[in-house]
Amino acid sequence: MSKGTPSRGKRQTQTHLTCRRCGRMSYHKRHKICSSCGFGRSTRMRSYGWITKRPKVATH
C-alpha cells in the first residue's frame, strides 16, 4: 500500500457509530464497544481519574 494521497481514498467505511447509552460517536462498529462510556464491555459507566482535571493546589 502506498502512502499519501492515494491511500486517503480508502477511508470511506464508518468505524464508530452513535452509542445508545451516552449518545457520542464512540461505539466501535466491529468491536461492539463504546470507547467513551464502555457500553458493550461493562454495565458500569467508564470513568477514570486521569480523565478529569484536578483542582490547583498551592505548593508553597
Curated annotation (Swiss-Prot):
Q: Which gene encodes it?
A: rpl37e
Q: Can you name this protein? A: Large ribosomal subunit protein eL37
Query: In which residues is Zn(2+) bound?
Result: 19, 22, 34, 37
Question: Where on this chain are zinc fingers (C4-type) annotated?
Answer: 19-37
Report one GO cellular component.
cytosolic large ribosomal subunit
| Key word rRNA-binding present | yes
Free-text cofactor note: Binds 1 zinc ion per subunit.
Identify the InterPro entries for this entry.
Ribosomal_eL37, Ribosomal_eL37/eL43, Ribosomal_eL37_CS, Ribosomal_zn-bd
Q: Which UniProt keywords apply?
A: Metal-binding, Ribonucleoprotein, Ribosomal protein, RNA-binding, rRNA-binding, Zinc, Zinc-finger
